[in-house]
């Protein structure tokens, strides 16, 4: 049995192809490609298929195409039991040229939970581009908290760190806060030279949550260097996850 698993976040998508053997699962190949966005967002369906296709291509490398027996994608923004989940399943089936009954699309939080705790109670807290917490009790009942999209519920995620860091940079540029190398680093990463350029950049549809999240490491570095305001951002984010 040849199985493809996809972990699709808003920043990148990872693909791993595994073969079932007498000794269990053996990894055949793996790679990563583009990230996804919400299916109802502009070009959402096209980006979803591109994420699957690009990560599969990266995993295969120079290999010939493999005939898959099953595929599962855990993707950011897929809500269990919704019409959106069915659409995502149809899209992965189309992209992989597989029958719909051989593929499954679900939320990445659920694949993480079942991967970490296949047959036991447990809790998974994900803080990536976005954030979500999901758990299962000893009766098999599952519950989730958070994960309602970066526009509504990003506290504790990389998106939120980058977003708040940019807010700091604008206050620095205005003179409302003392200037700090964080501002220059953030703007350099965005190829911006002014507050007006930053404002224009963040409303670009291609920037989105992943654009903010990519700036998060710079905020963490500034906190490690002693910037009090950056440290406050990290503490607020950590508290939001508890």
Residue ranges and their predicted role:
Residues 3-7, 68-72, 122-126, 133:
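Short glycine-aspartate micro-motif
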Residues 40, 141-192:
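Glycine-rich phosphate-binding loop plus the immediately following alpha-helix
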Residues 131-145, 213-216:
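Acidic-glycine-rich active-site phosphate/pyrophosphate-binding loop
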Residues 45-47, 51, 191-242:
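Adenine-nucleotide phosphate-binding core of ATP-dependent small-molecule kinases
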Residues 2-47, 66-67, 141-143, 147:
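Short glycine-rich, Thr/Ser-proximal phosphate-binding strand/loop in the N-terminal lobe
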Residues 37-40, 56-95, 105, 114-117:
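Short beta-strand-loop/turn "lid" adjacent to the catalytic site in phosphate-handling enzymes
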Residues 100-124, 141:
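Conserved phosphate-binding catalytic cores of ATP/NTP-utilizing and phosphoryl-transfer enzymes
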Residues 13-19, 114, 125, 131-136:
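Short beta-strand scaffold segments in enzyme catalytic cores
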